[in-house]
Amino acid sequence: MLTLSDFDFPLPPELIAQSALPDRSASRLLVVERLAPGDTADAVHMADRAFSDIVDYLRPDDLLVFNDTRVIKARFFGHKPSGGKVEVLVERVLDTHTVLAQVRASKTPVEGSALHLADDAFAVTVGPRVDQFFTLRFPEPALDLIERYGRLPLPPYITHDPDAYDETRYQTVYARSPGAVAAPTAGLHFDDALFARLDAAGVRRAFLTLHVGAGTFQPVRTENLAEHKMHSEWYAISEDLAQAVRETRARGGRVIAVGTTSLRALESAAQPDGTLAAGSGDTDIFITPGYRFRLVDALITNFHLPKSTLLMLVSALAGVQAIRAAYRHAVEQRYRFFSYGDAMLLTRQPDAAAA
């Protein structure tokens, strides 16, 4: 049985990308090509390419599925009426005026009290707790105040304060549905010029929405993976996407998830017969080696943190030994890691397909 320690690997800190490249598609791409069935390092071949070369590895009638969520300026600093400092990170917008949020303070805020945010620009009212989160009520539409006064919530491993460059580069060019507190980072490598080349090659694309929560950075704290409680995120699948999947299957194309968030949404809505159900809801799907994929054939993804649930996910798709070999190669070749880093193209190992 695999344990948390099986997903650890040494990572020199200087390989953690601290800023995005000026040219989105100029990042590097590690292509992990499957040569044979079985989960061994010898069963795959690795090719070091530029991300813009991904067109060479896609086929006419392949379907790329993107997550169109938009990162909101979810972080606030402020104070309690007593003067004590608080930090608020919005996790989810519940309705026009209400959000779920993490609140950091020296003492737990009291239900009914006020938190004064953004240099006293406005105050929110503390509501009931929901697990580790607080409900907060905004005096005006929450998304308006978030956009006006909030700060971009860069991941904890990026050490600089967010600036105007981050506000552009920590969004995909197709982001349109506000609600995420972390970017679907595999999509950061795509630009309009690359989309034009994909169109010319006959590669199709479609979109879903999954609002990425801060739980994506939540560490796994138990060696026994079965004891880990996965965070929940809201997603929506349109009938247009469900139809695009049906057409792709009929034409013999592959369903390729752009990012782990797209993959998690697709697999959450996948039916036993391999079709995709339109609709919306919450997912806390936790994909680990041994999972049988119903829908996704391949994945475009960045490099993930040691011992993370996302490293477990890519290991389930491509194979534990294949991913170990790929990550060793990436470290040796000085790839850039995490949100602003480089990418991989992974194909599903045959043993991971649903019967």
From Swiss-Prot:
Q: Which SUPFAM superfamilies match?
A: QueA-like
Provide the alphabetized UniProt keywords. Cytoplasm, Queuosine biosynthesis, S-adenosyl-L-methionine, Transferase
Q: Which cell locations does it reside in?
A: Cytoplasm
Which GO terms are recorded in the biological process aspect for this UniProt protein? queuosine biosynthetic process; tRNA wobble guanine modification
For this record, an example GO cellular component is: cytoplasm
What's an example of a GO molecular-function annotation for this chain?
S-adenosylmethionine:tRNA ribosyltransferase-isomerase activity
Q: Which InterPro entries match?
A: QueA (IPR003699), QueA_dom1 (IPR042118), QueA_dom2 (IPR042119), QueA_sf (IPR036100)
Q: Kindly indicate whether the keyword S-adenosyl-L-methionine belongs to this entry.
A: yes
Main EC class of this protein? transferase
Q: A Pfam family in this protein? A: Queuosine_synth
Q: What is its EC number?
A: 2.4.99.17
Entries under HAMAP family matching the protein: QueA
The subunit structure is: Monomer.
UniProt lists the family membership as follows: Belongs to the QueA family.
Q: Which NCBIfam families match?
A: PRK00147.1, queA
Report the protein's function: Transfers and isomerizes the ribose moiety from AdoMet to the 7-aminomethyl group of 7-deazaguanine (preQ1-tRNA) to give epoxyqueuosine (oQ-tRNA).
Instruction: Provide the protein name.
Output: S-adenosylmethionine:tRNA ribosyltransferase-isomerase
Q: Which organism is it from?
A: Cupriavidus taiwanensis (strain DSM 17343 / BCRC 17206 / CCUG 44338 / CIP 107171 / LMG 19424 / R1)
